[in-house]
Swiss-Prot record:
It comes from Arabidopsis thaliana. GO terms for cellular component: extracellular region. This is 31 kDa cell wall protein. The keyword Secreted applies. Keywords: Cell wall, Secreted. It comes from the Eukaryota. It is found in: Secreted, Cell wall.
Length: 14
């Protein structure tokens, strides 16, 4: 889902 993808991207930043 888009929301899950957003969390995945955040994980890359952290």
């Amino acid at each position: 889902s888009d929301r899950e993808l957003h969390r995945s991207k955040a994980a890359y930043f952290f």
